[in-house]
A protein has these predicted regions:
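N-terminal targeting/anchoring "stem" of glycan-biosynthesis enzymes
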Residues: 1-122
C-alpha cells in the first residue's frame, strides 16, 4: 500500500467489499470505498478510540470492530492514564487476535455487505 500511486490506491480501495485492518492511519483510505462496503477494524488490548467508526459512517461504509485480549505494556506502570502509556504501552504494541472471533465477525460482515451492497441474501 505504501508504494502505490494515489490513483492505484483509490482504485484498490474502491474495489474492496471488506477491508480487515489493524487500527492505524491506513484505515483513513476507507473514504475511497463504495458505500455499503465494510471495514473490520482490529484494536490492540485496551484501545478504545473509535475515529474510524465515525469516518465509516460519514462515507456510508459499514463498520465492525473487535479488540484483542492482552496486557498493557510496562510503559503504563508509572501512570496508566498518561499519553505515554496510551501510545507506547497500548496503541503501538503488537497484538494477537483470536481466530474464532475474527471468523465469527467476518461471517456477519460478509452477510451484511452482500445483503446491503448487492441485495443478495445468503
Amino acid at each position: 500500500m505504501e508504494k502505490s500511486s494515489g490513483e492505484a490506491l483509490i482504485r484498490q480501495f474502491a474495489s474492496l467489499d471488506v477491508l480487515v485492518a489493524a487500527h492505524g492511519a491506513g484505515v483513513t483510505n476507507i473514504i475511497f470505498m463504495v458505500p455499503n462496503s465494510a471495514v473490520y477494524e482490529l484494536f490492540p488490548p485496551f484501545w478504545q478510540y473509535g475515529c474510524y467508526r465515525r469516518l465509516a459512517s460519514n462515507v456510508g461504509v459499514l463498520y465492525a470492530k473487535d479488540t484483542a485480549v492482552g496486557v498493557k505494556g510496562r510503559e503504563c506502570d508509572r501512570d496508566p492514564n498518561s499519553l505515554y502509556c496510551q501510545y507506547n504501552g497500548i496503541r503501538d504494541r503488537d497484538f494477537v487476535m483470536n481466530v474464532t472471533v475474527i471468523e465469527r465477525r467476518m461471517k456477519k460482515v460478509v452477510w451484511e455487505v452482500w445483503n446491503k451492497k448487492y441485495h443478495v441474501v445468503l
